[in-house]
Amino acid sequence: MILSPQSQLLERNIALFDEGQWAFINPSDAYFLDGLKSQEVTVIHQYFDIFAECVRVIPSASFDSRDITSKGFEVSQKVGNHTHIFTPFVALEKSHTDVMISLPKAKTHFQMLLRMAASMVGQNGRIHVVGENKGGIKSAAKLMQQYGATQKVDSARHCSLITVIVEAPHLAFEAEAWIDTNTYAVEGTSWKVASMPGVFSYKELDAGTELLLEKLSTSLSGDVLDFACGAGVIASYIMLKYPHLKLHLTDVSALAIYCSALTLAENQLAATLYAADGLHGMTNKVQHIVTNPPFHTGIKTDYTVTKRFISDAKARLTRGGTMQMVANRFLPYPGLLSEHFQTVYTTAQTSQFSVYQATL
């Protein structure tokens, strides 16, 4: 398996990991860690796809939203000397000497991870960040300076590795400080949404999602899946507007699962949440899928997730089932939908977005 450019840069600096108690946050792939089999390391995963690749035994994880409190949740699995934890956050204090963060796309997400890492390593501990040069590693270095003097350790494969020694002590990470709750209204229905950095449409109602909800079919029945649920915007709206429906929510992100549970609780709702890589590992069938699917992986446009989702959706829908989807107009989804569904209609369109309804 070819390592990601970030992991190739870390492999060049493998001696860095010879000493200390290491933790990794959101490694960019599962395979670099194979080179550290003799070391005891903790790996914090906010993304289920890499977690599942690392542990190689868990295809999906399901949660009752009522079981997820403000304290979060975790799914942990030991693989040799490595402890892998799928979780939205950890509140550890002085648990490690070194934390390696893979640079996320959103600046606010990175700021949150930095704060979490600072409490993990404590005063005089080291935080390391690896990321693509095009992904904002230079601005990341500036953000790191609030914790201490930064040092560029290496640069290769169009990536950089930067280290900061934490100068001051930090209390345990508090997720509540990063939660933002807003009230939205669409078609006469208002509801609250809890979101955090790193979750799609943080602090705002995405215009595409709003269009999808405005044009939502009124002939929904039975079980409905909100794929790539983010903060639970779509599912909570549908449950409030059509309380007879049973909703299921899925996302690859632990932060999304966490925020969705908080959103449901804010609106006195409950549902089953699934952490999964696409629809992999999900076995139950539904009558309808409603989604605003992702088209980015990191900083790059990437249709792979949605292509696979569209082809897999057939197996999750009952006969005559429907999928309602919003997407940027420039994306080639009508043709993809037509390959797998009997009928595909464009039900709404703006200068930026299209809403499609596909029926098996």
Curated annotation (Swiss-Prot):
Is the Membrane keyword given for this protein? no
Q: Which reaction does it catalyse?
A: guanosine(1207) in 16S rRNA + S-adenosyl-L-methionine = N(2)-methylguanosine(1207) in 16S rRNA + S-adenosyl-L-homocysteine + H(+)
What is the E.C. number? 2.1.1.172
A GO cellular-component term linked to this record: cytoplasm
Q: Which UniProt keywords apply?
A: Cytoplasm, Methyltransferase, rRNA processing, S-adenosyl-L-methionine, Transferase
Kindly give the InterPro entries that the UniProt entry links to this protein: DNA_methylase_N6_adenine_CS, Mtase_sm_N, rRNA_ssu_MeTfrase_C, RsmC/RlmG, SAM-dependent_MTases_sf, Small_mtfrase_dom
Q: Where in the cell is it found?
A: Cytoplasm
Q: What is its main location?
A: cytoplasm
Query: Assembly and partners?
Result: Monomer.
Provide the function of this protein.
Specifically methylates the guanine in position 1207 of 16S rRNA in the 30S particle.
- Report the sequence similarity comment from the record: Belongs to the methyltransferase superfamily. RsmC family.
Q: What is this protein called?
A: Ribosomal RNA small subunit methyltransferase C
